[in-house]
């Protein structure tokens, strides 16, 4: 009997988990309908009901960052901050949060561009410029600067340029469809992470660019 209870606990969603999932799915529909404010409220509720729903938390933090609500995003991200080594999407959020923190103190883009023009190996300036782009959601512009670093010095700053580039790809990727509330938890996922749907030509182009720079 104890084994049955353990199995059910692991594979059958609780009422709270089902309610949180329903809130998260409603949020997705609201985003598609162009109502991010209502979606934020739904996602906040989903995370409050089921703090362990990392998918809902990811969507919540991502939407906060898209709207520039850094302090709220940091607070919502804190409970999963130690999971970044295990989840590529959460790691991507950590990089985005770092970019928004740094962007607030970044030098003027024109100053950075001048520094880069004077010295194409001024990686500090390039990375700083990439962070301002990343923070503002200008993802391809950010990756263009990061790629220039990777092409010249793959290991610069403990591989920071490549790691940030990969994080941006993860932020841009559309996740695979979520499990319905009645489906078993623990369904197959790629290396324990939510699989991403690859159907975006821009994403594919920038993945190829990184691969060519690395190999």
Task: Pin down the residues of each PLM region.
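Long, contiguous interaction/recruitment modules in multidomain scaffold/adaptor proteins
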Residues: 1-25, 32-33, 38-51, 55-56, ...
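A conserved position within tetratricopeptide repeats
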Residues: 8, 12, 47, 74, ...
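Structural register within alpha-helical repeat arrays
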Residues: 26, 60, 94, 129, ...
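Inward-facing hydrophobic residues that define packing positions of alpha-helical scaffold repeats
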Residues: 43, 77-78, 112-113, 145-146, ...
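Short coil turns that delineate tetratricopeptide repeat
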Residues: 51, 84-85, 119-121, 137, ...
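Alpha-helical adaptor scaffolds
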Residues: 77-119
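Terminal, low-structured helical/coil segments at or just beyond the last alpha-helical repeat
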Residues: 174-215
């Amino acid at each position: 009997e104890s084994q049955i209870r353990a199995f059910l606990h692991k594979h059958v969603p609780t009422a709270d988990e089902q309610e949180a999932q329903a809130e998260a799915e409603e949020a997705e529909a609201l985003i598609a309908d162009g109502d991010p404010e209502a979606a934020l409220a739904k996602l906040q509720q989903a995370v409050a009901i089921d703090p362990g729903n990392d998918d809902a938390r990811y969507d919540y933090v991502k939407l906060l960052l898209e709207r520039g609500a850094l302090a709220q995003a940091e607070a919502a991200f804190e409970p999963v901050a130690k999971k970044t080594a295990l989840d590529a999407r959460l790691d991507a959020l950590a990089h985005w949060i770092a970019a928004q923190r740094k962007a607030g103190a970044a030098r003027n883009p024109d100053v950075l561009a001048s520094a880069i023009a004077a010295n194409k190996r001024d990686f500090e300036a390039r990375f700083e410029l990439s962070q301002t782009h990343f923070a503002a959601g200008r993802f391809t512009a950010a990756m263009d600067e990061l790629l220039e670093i990777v092409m010249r010095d793959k290991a610069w700053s403990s591989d920071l340029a490549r790691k940030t580039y990969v994080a941006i790809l993860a932020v841009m990727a559309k996740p695979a469809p979520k499990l319905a509330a009645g489906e078993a938890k623990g369904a197959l996922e790629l290396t324990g992470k939510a699989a991403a749907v690859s159907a975006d030509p821009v994403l594919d182009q920038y993945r190829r660019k990184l691969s060519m720079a690395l190999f």
